[in-house]
Structure formats: C-alpha cells, structure tokens
Amino acid sequence: DESLLIQNLKQYFDFEVRRQEFVGPQVGSELRDQGGLGLLAALAVMMVYIMFRFQYKFALGALLALIHDVLIVLGFFSFFSLDFDLSVLAAILAVIGYSLNDTIVVSDRVRENFRKKRRSDSEIAINRSLSQMIGRTLITSLTTLLVLIALLIFGGETISNFSIALIVGVISGTYSSIYIVCNTLLSLKVTSEDLMIRKTEVLDDGMP
C-alpha cells in the first residue's frame, strides 16, 4: 500500500509529500492511441512530401519501405516479448525519419541518373544509382549503429528498449531503402518520362 510505504519511509527520513500523480491504464491507453495517430499522421505527411518532391511511384515505394520497417520493429518486440511503451513508439517515429532519409537519397540519385541519360534502361539506371550510393548508405548506418550499441550497453535499463527499437529499425531501414524502394520502382516501370523536369522547377532553378 502507498500510504504504508510512506509511513515506513518517514521512520528513517524526514520528508514531506507535496504532490502525488498516478497514471492509470485509461491514461496509458489514451497515450498509446494518440501515439498511433501521430504515427499515421507522420506517414501521411511524408508520403505527400515524396509525391510532390519526386513522383507518386516513388511515394509508393517509400510507403512500402516505411510500413516494412515499422512491422519489423513491432514483430521483433512481439517475438521476444519485450515491453512496448511510449519510448519505443518514439523510437519507431525516429526510425521512420531515418528510413525516409535513406529513401530520399536513393530516389534523388535515381532521378538524377534518369535525367542525365533519358534513353537509359530503367534497370540499368537504378542499378547505377545503387552502385553510386550504397557505400555512403552502409557507412552512415554502421556509424549510427555504433552509437546505438553504445547507448544500449551504457544507457541503462530505462532506455534499453528505446535503443533496441532503433537498432532494429536502422538495420531494417538500410536494406528496405535499397531493395524495397528500387524493386518497387522497377515493378511500377518508372521511366525517364516520369521524371521530366517541370517548368516550375526550371523557373525555380533560374531564380537568384
């Protein structure tokens, strides 16, 4: 009992309880639901951004990659029966941002190669893009994982699940941005015509 605990502590320590807070299961479920809505909102906003920044085929590839990464993290925690709390939800949001960053790097390189050689075959252009950026992606992921592993080892039990979620998400996001996004573009038969420079882009580039 809480009152009994306070009485026992007062026998050894001189203190005064000025405020008590209790987070019940209802509040916890509300926070979980709000976090889930925030997760969906983040996915929607990112898809709209990629659609306008690149093209809808790239948005579909990014969506599949992000869903894949989220499911991998959730499946990992479910398989090993790890606690899922708000810190893990925050880690999933961070994983979405990390994976999206890799996806944008890949998409930008694919678009650049298509525009350089308009008559290039889609498979050749995408393979060339992967060859050009895979080293950068792997080095970035490895350096990030080193930091996260150190955080897991020395960060304590409080943030252990947060660190685990980020480690799993970074590994998943690395290969999903390379394989899932590019294979989706090949399946959707993206061509150089899909990535023609619009007049608005030309005007923007010509502005001081």
Enumerate the language-model features and the residues they cover.
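A structural signal for conserved, well-ordered secondary-structure elements
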Residues: 1-208
